Amino acid sequence: NIAAGTDEGYVVDPMCGTGGILIESALTGRATLGIDFDPVMVEGSQQNIDWAQVDAEVKRGDATRFELPKDVAAVVVDPPYGRNSPSDEKLIEDMLANIRSQNSECKLVVILPVEAGGDDLDEEITTDIELPGYEIKSAFGIPVHKSLGRVMIIAEASTQD
């Protein structure tokens, strides 16, 4: 609901993993597409979709090169974490460039891991994180446990390109 606002257009997760975002999206009645590079994740995601008895499509592909459906309302992505290396940042930048080159109007929701703690996490994130080609509209800190939090970033295509 945060991502797409209406029932119009696809919700796409280009790093769908086990399919949690796909299931949540499909439960709202939206057209839903998931992409993952790992065939084991694609198979597991499909099994979870089947178990949840929802209508979502999942296929193998590269987040930096996949083709978006024509009618995309939002891209929602919760990239795999635990590595936080420069190559991970490059992967996200390349994924964003791919999306932006195909669709300049869809919303973007990115969920990222952050160090837990601090009362102004939302403000810190909006000043510390850049999403090339996108303007961050809001960010919400989500505590997970003592040392780990997550942040949900909602962004729209930047008009300054």
Report the location of each language-model feature.
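Class I S-adenosyl-L-methionine-dependent methyltransferase catalytic core
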Residues: 1-161
